[in-house]
Amino acid sequence: MNKINEKRKSLINIGSATVYIEIFVLSAILLGASLFFLKDYDAYRAIFLIRIILIAVAALSLIKWAKLKRAEALLSYDSYDGGIGLEVANKLMDRAHIDDGDKVLDVGAGSGLLSIAIAGRFKGSKVVMFDYVNNDDEIIAAREGRLTEEEIRNVSRRSGKFLPLPFENGEFDVVVSGFSLHTDKDNRDKSVLIREALRPLKKGGRFALMDILNEAHGFKDIDNMLYELENNVVSEISTEYMFRDLEEAEEFKKAGIRDARLIYGVK
């Protein structure tokens, strides 16, 4: 997985230089063209040519900017790959109390970091990576690259919508999710997704769900929802903020993650 991120870093570094080179070259062409064509009787040609070149500069710069932003976003998404990601994955696994041989559902697997971490540690377990149908091609490519690179065999893939999940009641021993539910595109109130994520969990099964649990990310009345879950759905539930100290909080904020909370317990 480090190779994947190194490639993205290279794209960002090389791409940034390329943008400046392209702008410089096209600007030089623009200047040269204006000097060559700028004559009274041909002023309209100069203006027309300048407009065409400006449009080309803008279009090429915009395309390159979009590619760079995408690479930066994926790198940030998988900065999860090292410090933050490894710590988050380990904490989720620890709180979920996974046993070797468990059937585990990862809701919103994304690029597969959490699923692959679980499958690598618990080689006797079966891990189902579930994510959006028609998810981003680059995220899918990153996921497949990880599976190949890590030589993971005990993982299967499913896709669909989060509501409802395409699984039977009580199908899994463990349900986990890492920073995924808030990205759901189909439901304004993301709180209902937590309840749905617990539906395929067996009675007595363990869960650990981490997300950005605030109203800005679609989670409404989260405390009331947790109270309702504790009294009607699960037998044990705990919650904790991910920030142990100010330094860690800053690291999460750099990765675009605020109000990160972990919900875990037993159904």
Predicted feature descriptions by range:
Residues 66-90:
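Class I SAM-dependent methyltransferase Rossmann-like catalytic core
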Residues 101-110:
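Conserved class I S-adenosyl-L-methionine
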Residues 112-116:
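Glycine-rich SAM-binding Motif I of class I
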Residues 117-163:
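Class I SAM-dependent methyltransferase SAM/SAH-binding core
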Residues 163-175:
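A short acidic, Gly/Pro-enriched loop at the edge of an enzyme's catalytic core
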Residues 191-203:
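A short glycine-rich, Lys/Arg-flanked "PGG" loop and its adjoining helix->strand segment in the class I
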Residues 204-211:
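Conserved beta-strand signature within the Rossmann-like core of class I S-adenosyl-L-methionine
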Residues 245-267:
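Core SAM-dependent methyltransferase catalytic element
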